[in-house]
Amino acid sequence: MTTTAAHPTALPAAARRAELEAALGAVTARVAAAAAACGRDPRGITLVAVTKTRPAADARLLHALGVRHLGENHDREAAAKAADLADLAGHPEPPQWHFVGSLQRNKAASVARYASLVHSVDRPALVAALSRGALNAGRTLPCLLQVSLDGDPRRGGVPADGLAALADAVADAPGLRLAGVMAVAPLGGPADAAFDRLAALAARLRADHPRATAVSAGMSGDLETAVAAGATHVRIGSALLGGRAYPARVGTPPGATDPEAYGPAGARTTGTHATPLGGAA
């Protein structure tokens, strides 16, 4: 079951709030039901609300409704929204920004200034860039290692056989903290098998790095499968905020007017959306 909010066409603030509140309730119920089905405590699952392509006003409304974890996959948009919501820094539970998209090295310093968790670390060069950015910002930046579950280089992710070395690189990098793993289910493949493989890789990682406990997996269409496989973070976009209207781009797959996340040339990247049901990044 996927509950989708109506496309917001310049709705008044009160109407948009009501729409988001209803969608949030439906998604929260889905997560709770998925947790109950596999004997998990829903408070151990963080709902990341991915607000990409949506106005900062939506992010602000979600925060007012109790959402604390907000996801973005482009630095320019994420940095602008973080600045727009900077007045909430004094809130008892300020917004936590998750960077969930493919990250270029030249954007690492910017992301290191505002991100609470980077989900998409997949290569040593990015580790070095984020480390420099975190040190310059005077903060420690938690990072997840994005694992490739299908071997498609367009979608990002470190191959499974490179995970241990990349984990050691993050663990040894000043200014960074290894927090766990992230993955996106293969396009057209069974999500359950993919997420079970991710769970096995996460367990192997924890054996060497016991504090790396986070598993970011699952989006609007497969969150139940991800929760069953042990996801600690689910990245929810369209089920919370409604279908997105993307401008036509060369290489975008036919019919992909509302992908959870497509990058340049149709390469699918991470899509994330969030509210904590109790967990924290």
Predicted features and spans:
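Intrinsically disordered low-complexity regions specifically enriched for long asparagine
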Residues: M1-T2, A281
